[in-house]
Design a protein with these regions (language model features):
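N-terminal [4Fe-4S]-dependent radical SAM core
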Residues: 26-74
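Conserved catalytic motifs of the protein kinase core domain
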Residues: 3, 71, 159
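Conserved non-cysteine loop/helix-boundary elements of the Radical SAM core domain that shape
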Residues: 92-232
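Local cysteine-cluster metal-coordination motifs and their immediate loop/turn environment
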Residues: 77-92
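Conserved small/polar residues in nucleotide/adenosyl-binding loops
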Residues: 1-10, 226-233
Length: 236
């Protein structure tokens, strides 16, 4: 199958293929040298080479601005999901069982935010990542409450990226996206994990492929896509 479309398309599967051009950029390689390496080594298509290299250059530009000596990054976890995926090992709980405890969790989270802000007041906050779980399981007013608290508690003048993981398409609504836009969130991540409906059903992802496409459309912003080859039926 060498040289076939299937071989070319499958040659860059796996986690973070942009690490390849990123490493080459760090070594001082030019775009032409990166192109030739990825073409000869991975049989990658021109489209994938260009995309991976473009993203690597953007990442590299951000990384150069990070204050590694006096900076820090903040992770905030929202441990709730619409359902629990079959493969998941993260600390996460079905929202249906914990819905009446979410506001209490946010109360505790706000106290921890106050503590963290006081502890690191003398350092530069470089990036914020709200992950999970699925942060967009929060209601719009809860998302607004959380982000407002973050914005009021930390100095974000040196913050290069503010990410909210919108990992489940079935948790995304226009109202929630409007909250994120209002607060100037610079990056969201919509993760279908797979575009095969049979795999979604097998792993307990209670959304459709069509919902993923619709979520991308209403977001109308560049998003990250994690494709998890979660089942042997996707190997063919």
């Amino acid at each position: 199958l060498v040289g076939s479309e299937m071989c070319i398309r499958d040659s860059l599967t796996g986690i973070r293929p942009t690490k390849i051009p990123m490493k080459l950029l760090e070594e001082g390689k030019s775009r032409e040298e990166i192109y030739r390496y990825m073409k000869d080594t991975y049989f990658a298509s021109d489209e994938k080479i260009e995309l991976a290299t473009d993203i690597a250059e953007r990442e590299n530009a951000i990384l150069k601005k990070i204050d590694y000596d006096n900076g820090y990054s903040l992770y905030i976890g929202i441990p709730f999901c619409p359902t629990t995926c079959l493969y998941c090992s993260f600390t996460s709980y079905p929202l249906v069982s914990w819905k009446n405890r979410v506001d209490a969790y946010l109360d505790a989270l706000e106290r921890e935010i106050d503590y963290t802000a006081a502890k690191f007041y003398h350092k530069n906050l470089n990036s914020i990542y709200i992950g999970g779980g699925t942060p967009t399981t929060l209601e719009p007013y809860q998302l607004d409450r959380l982000i407002r608290k973050i914005k009021c508690s930390f100095d974000l003048s040196d913050c290069l990226e503010f990410t909210v993981e919108a990992g489940r398409p079935d948790s995304i609504t226009r109202e929630k996206l409007e909250v994120l836009r209002k607060w100037g969130i610079s990056r969201i991540s919509i993760n279908p994990q797979t575009m095969q409906q049979r795999t979604l059903d097998l792993i307990g992802r209670r959304h459709s492929v069509e919902q993923t496409v619709e979520s991308f459309k209403i977001a109308r912003e560049p998003v990250s896509y994690t494709h998890l080859r979660a089942h042997e039926t996707e190997l063919h």
